[in-house]
Amino acid sequence: MRHYEIVLLIHPDQSEQVPAMLERYKGLVTAAGGKVHRVEDWGRRQLAYLINKLAKAHYLCLNIECSKETLLELETGFKFNDAVLRHLTVVKSKAETAPSIMMKAVEREESRKAPQPQEAAA
């Protein structure tokens, strides 16, 4: 089995259904004997250019280990799911389990937006 990193751009109106989509895709991988090493929800972000007249999309990143047949089944599901605007699959040499650079940036943005304890007391 090979290691893959999959990045999905989900329609922003379908953000509520992202957890169910993740569970379905993770279940598909594990049912076929694969492993899910990392799942990251990067949230709703600005697109560099319009896709289907949309300026934002919900980003997801999955690092999985599965067979080629399972990957083809996943990609077919992405193509026929109207909520998936784009997907990108990259072959990796090993399993990635550490947080990605994007996830660190998301965490940094969230910590900056959260009110500081000193400000809340004032």
Swiss-Prot record:
Which InterPro entries did the record assign? Ribosomal_bS6, Ribosomal_bS6_CS, Ribosomal_bS6_sf, Ribosomal_S6_plastid/chlpt, Transl_elong_EF1B/ribsomal_bS6
Alphabetical keyword list: Ribonucleoprotein, Ribosomal protein, RNA-binding, rRNA-binding
Which SUPFAM superfamilies does this chain map to? Ribosomal protein S6
Instruction: Please name the GO terms that the record assigns under molecular function.
Output: small ribosomal subunit rRNA binding; structural constituent of ribosome
Cellular component terms, GO, for this chain's entry?
Answer: cytosolic small ribosomal subunit
Has keyword Oxidoreductase?
no
UniProt entry tagged with the keyword Ribonucleoprotein: yes
Q: Per UniProt, what is one Pfam family of this protein?
A: Ribosomal_S6
- Gene3D superfamilies found in the cross-reference section: 3.30.70.60
| Superkingdom classification of source | Bacteria
GO biological process terms, alphabetically, are:
translation
Alphabetized HAMAP family for the sequence:
Ribosomal_bS6
Function noted in UniProt: Binds together with bS18 to 16S ribosomal RNA.
Its family remark reads: Belongs to the bacterial ribosomal protein bS6 family.
User: What NCBIfam families would the database entry show?
Assistant: S6 (TIGR00166)
Please give the name of this protein. Small ribosomal subunit protein bS6
> Which species does the entry assign this protein to?
Methylibium petroleiphilum (strain ATCC BAA-1232 / LMG 22953 / PM1)
Q: List the top taxonomic levels of the source.
A: Bacteria, Pseudomonadati, Pseudomonadota, Betaproteobacteria, Burkholderiales
